[in-house]
Amino acid sequence: MKIVVFGGDGFCGWPTSLKLAAEGHSVVIVDNLSRRAIDEQLSSGSLTNIAPIKQRILSAQKFVGDIRFEFLDICKDPAGLGNLLRREKPHTVVHFAEQRAAPYSMIGDGERRYTVDNNVTSTHNICSAIVEIDRNINIVHLGTMGVYGYSKVFGSIPEGYLNIQIKSTKKDADVLYLANPGSIYHMTKYLDQLVFQFYNKNWGLKITDLHQGIVWGTETAQTSLAPDLTNRFDYDGIYGTVMNRFISQAANGMVCH
């Protein structure tokens, strides 16, 4: 089937795109390469060598399967997003096109505004475009369990909605689980799920919103096929996940705390 992967050049998007192509799907990566630009802004980079996007795609086509690249900023160019969906007619879109680092989202005013503008507007643009073009397109979104916070006060987190009883009316209701985001980034993921709930309720969009834990690691079966397919390995204090930093410290004989 045809699958569009928004943010397919990033840490999660790239190996996902390769996996989908390896399974026989026709994959279109859509990305504005913002993660590479942020590397320059922070004067940091991946521990692994990341090939230019053109080399990445050529290598993926040679070793993996049917995969293409479209440069597009879906936050700033909703018309371009609509044109792409009309042209490609995907069965599913996978949405990774968001600034993903909680520490980055808390650096300062510019980073806070960029994270909110990019993440929430990109999500809304996808939903709005699908309403106009084809409501049968499936949306798969990578959220984060961080929208719930890390307190034990609210108890275990259920799948789907939380069933409650409203005291004043004694009526039962299904609501989104209580949010307690710890950063601007996590807050945007909570706002995303409000957007998704609204579009599902009013237009019946088919949406899978995944709230997973920390994603970590280096390689997959596909990224290991050729040097140009190598995935990111961020180990800095902004984009490096705690697992990656622990791995880097252990490899250098440092004690992990």
Where do the model's predicted regions map?
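N-terminal Rossmann-like NAD(P)+-binding domain of SDR-like oxidoreductases, especially those catalyzing
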Residues: 1-218
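A conserved pocket-lining segment of Rossmann-fold NAD(P)-dependent short-chain dehydrogenase/reductase
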Residues: 105-106, 172-180, 207, 212-214, ...
